[in-house]
Curated annotation (Swiss-Prot):
UniProt pathway annotation: Amino-acid biosynthesis; L-lysine biosynthesis via DAP pathway; LL-2,6-diaminopimelate from (S)-tetrahydrodipicolinate (acetylase route): step 1/3
Record's catalysed reaction(s): (S)-2,3,4,5-tetrahydrodipicolinate + acetyl-CoA + H2O = L-2-acetamido-6-oxoheptanedioate + CoA
GO MF entry, a single one: tetrahydrodipicolinate N-acetyltransferase activity
Species whose genome carries this gene: Lactococcus lactis subsp. cremoris (strain SK11)
Protein name: 2,3,4,5-tetrahydropyridine-2,6-dicarboxylate N-acetyltransferase
Amino-acid biosynthesis is among the record's keywords: yes
Length: 257
């Protein structure tokens, strides 16, 4: 696993509760921001970029030319004074990302995995080497994904959900998350497990290694190792045999980096 350190439910609750809540915005403007009235003008009459950075404001572009295109990125409360005297949709446009958000997205630059555009991965998620996260997947805070595991398109891993090594969570599947109450147990999926498309694994359920959850199943009870479960609610329909193992085998080439 890389990146985050494993957190308990109580630690996640404290992390969210104590986090500075931010409304991140990206402002694109032509015109000059109100550096003086916002208190960001240096003695030499130029923008005080150090003071801006200390407030978490990132500025891009030529701020010495009035009508050149500029970009300002930061928390709305810090950025708003810079727009005094300017007119929205005339002098500038704003893109918002959330409102009073407590948990940023995960910085994935150091992760040795394949993460496709459009995946939403929150901070404090652990991702193993050669894992694959497909577009549209949503991974909530505290989730863990083992080495070589694929999270397919549109799948959802709720808070603290855990998936072992070399497993596959099918498109649209949901592993229910548990952050509150803190005493509740999260979903745990073992190694070499296949969870079919649009299946749902309810809070606290454990799926044993080597098992298969059929597409569309709703799993409300623990699943033993090396069995196939199907239905609503899911029930064991057979043990894993050679034919099933062949049909559900993973493709290593998809995990190459």
């Amino acid at each position: 696993m890389t990146q985050a350190q494993k957190l308990s439910a109580q630690e996640i609750i404290q992390f969210i509760g104590n986090a500075e809540k931010k409304t991140q915005v990206k402002v694109t403007l032509s015109g000059m921001p109100s550096f003086k009235s916002a208190g960001f003008l240096a003695e030499n009459g130029r923008p005080n970029f150090k003071a801006l950075a200390n407030k978490g404001i990132q500025v891009l572009g030529d701020f010495h030319t009035h009508y050149s295109l500029k970009i300002i990125i930061g928390d709305w409360q810090a950025v708003r004074p810079l727009l005094e005297g300017l007119t929205e949709n005339k002098d500038y446009t704003i893109e918002f990302e959330g409102r009073n958000s407590a948990v940023p997205l995960l910085d994935t630059r150091a992760i040795n995995a394949r993460i496709e555009p459009g995946a939403i991965i929150r901070d404090q998620v652990m991702i193993g080497d050669n894992a694959v996260i497909m577009m549209g997947a949503i991974i909530n805070i505290g989730a863990e994904i083992g080495e070589g595991t694929m999270i397919d398109m549109g799948a959802v891993l709720g808070g603290r959900a855990t998936v072992g090594k070399n497993s596959h969570i099918g498109a649209g599947a949901v592993l229910a998350g548990v952050i509150e109450p803190a005493s509740a147990e999260p979903v745990r999926v073992g190694d070499n497990v296949l969870v079919g498309a649009n299946a749902v694994v309810i809070e606290g359920v454990q799926v044993g290694s080597g098992s298969v959850v059929a597409a569309g199943a709703i799993v409300t009870q623990d699943v033993p190792e090396n069995v196939v479960v199907a239905g609503v609610p899911a029930r064991t329909i057979k043990e894993i045999d050679e034919k099933t193992a062949q049909k559900t085998a993973l493709e290593d080439a998809l995990r190459n980096l």
